[in-house]
Amino acid sequence: MMESIKKLRELTGAGMMDVKKALSDAGNDEDKAVALLRERGIVKAAKKADREAKEGIVRFVVEGNRAAIVEVNSETDFVARNSDFQALVEKLAQTALSAKTNDVEEFRNFSMDGETVGTVVAAAAGKIGENLVLNRVAYIEGDKVAGYVHSNGKIGVLVDVAGGDETKAKDVALHVAAERPQYLSRDEVNQDDIEKEREILTNKALNEGKPQQIVEKIVSGQIGKFYEEKVLPEQRYVKDNSMTVGQYLGDASVKRFVRFEIGA
């Protein structure tokens, strides 16, 4: 019980007594307890517990209509800023372009300098003196491909834009880095999650004393806002919030995007 209380306090930021009561009312079901806390207005949204931040950098390579991106973690920011480490990550990105994979385990076994990628990373770790982890890799091939790295390599993005030019592709990559979209369209959103969210928001509004006849309107507005925050074409465009990303793109469309962020 105490372990669950500690976990939910970290997860929601709620007080001990509120968490304890929610767990009791939920029959010690942690997910149900989080939903109860939200319905009671004690927390605004379920959020993940803070995790120890990983250091490292993200690098990408674009060649024509192909691109690859990698994330490599280090123990300290000092190593992340080390020129040897940065050169390694850049070479890994170039190698990923040849590997054409989105599977990090497959990439670790890919050939590089007569060794496997995993062996090369392990050797670099021994030389640098820190544990290095090849965390993620992605490869895209499409129409107009562009990339963007932000915040000293802490965030990296690749996008594939169909029907657009290089400027639009680069602008969308910058937007994705800044605004953290999660979906390309509403169709990608798990409808079970939406219904669960709708139920929580409905119960919360009713618990706040909102009249039944306006609760549905309130909840629909909040669900719409969820889509506006999470679905790329519906987000307000970062360079001009008078329009959405979809409006900025016009006849063009984003076919795929990849966003890596250190520690996320």
Swiss-Prot record:
Region span, Involved in Mg(2+) ion dislocation from EF-Tu: 76-79
Which Gene3D superfamilies does the UniProt record give?
A: 1.10.286.20, DNA helicase RuvA subunit, C-terminal domain, Elongation factor Ts, dimerisation domain
Entry GO MF terms: translation elongation factor activity
Principal place of residence: cytoplasm
The family database entries (InterPro entries) matched by this protein are listed as: EF-Ts_dimer_sf (IPR036402), Transl_elong_EFTs/EF1B (IPR001816), Transl_elong_EFTs/EF1B_dimer (IPR014039), Transl_elong_Ts_CS (IPR018101), UBA-like_sf (IPR009060)
Q: Where in or outside the cell is it found?
A: Cytoplasm
What is the recorded name of this protein?
Answer: Elongation factor Ts
Q: Which organism is it from?
A: Deinococcus deserti (strain DSM 17065 / CIP 109153 / LMG 22923 / VCD115)
